Amino acid sequence: MEDIQNYDINTIPSSSYNIWVAKRRSGKSVLCEYLIHQMIEAGLVDMCFLFSATDAGFNIIKDKECRFTDISKLDNILQFYKKANEYNKIVSKSKKIKLRTVIIIDDMAVDLKSKNFNILEDLAIRGRHYSYDPLSLHFHILSQSLTKVPRVCRLNCDNLFMNTIPSVTELEMILNENFYILDSSRTGKQDGKKLYHDLVTRDDFIFIVIENYKQNCKCYADYLKTYKADISVLDLK
């Protein structure tokens, strides 16, 4: 097996679109919260918002005004960023708005794909353009099912976090889109599939990170990482 390294939070793009796919109670929310904790510790975050129908978990976000059960509030944040982006284009460097924000959307992909909130694909394609330096905007989309996330979103995301995929159909989608890109021959596909299984069974609650933003990848280690939460630093009560 290739020498796949642990994920380093300092490699995350200045603005990013991230997808988390794993079944219920698999640890994806805990790992996402751990990533946010690491981003805060690294000085990469000023504000963090949670959109969740159940308003559960993510105790790291303590301010109730930053927790929403209605996805429609997301548009207010996006509109602010659009205006701040335009403002920063016309003012001097010292007057530019500097704001680094994380937005977590937890199992609300169905709402985002509805007629009223058809913004999931727009965020994947244009979301980063709402936040040019010194603005920063990170999206974390959590879903129990890969098929709930449109293919254009998967292909345009910066990072895809996942662990064991129980659905054969969804697993083949993951393998085709991410593990066969270096070698699509029969042997190459066998090697890619074996690597996936080796990584997801390496340790309990371990996740694979697919760094889609990486370019000129010549081996799996160039764009694949593993990631596991240190729960001792989190408030999981």
Where are these regions (language model features)?
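Pre-Walker A adenine-sensing motif
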Residues: M1-P13
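Active-site regions of enzymes building and remodeling cell-envelope glycoconjugates
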Residues: I61-N76
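Conserved P-loop NTPase motor cores
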Residues: S16-Q38, A53-A56, S72-G188
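Post-Walker A helix-loop "phosphate-sensing" segment adjacent to the P-loop in P-loop NTPases
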Residues: H37-C48
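Short, hydrophobic beta-strand segments that form beta-sheet elements in well-ordered domains
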Residues: D46-A53, R67, F139-S143, V209
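A domain-level signal for caspase-like cysteine endopeptidase catalytic cores
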Residues: F49, I60-I61
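Short, structured coil segments at secondary-structure junctions
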Residues: L44, I61-K64, L155-N156
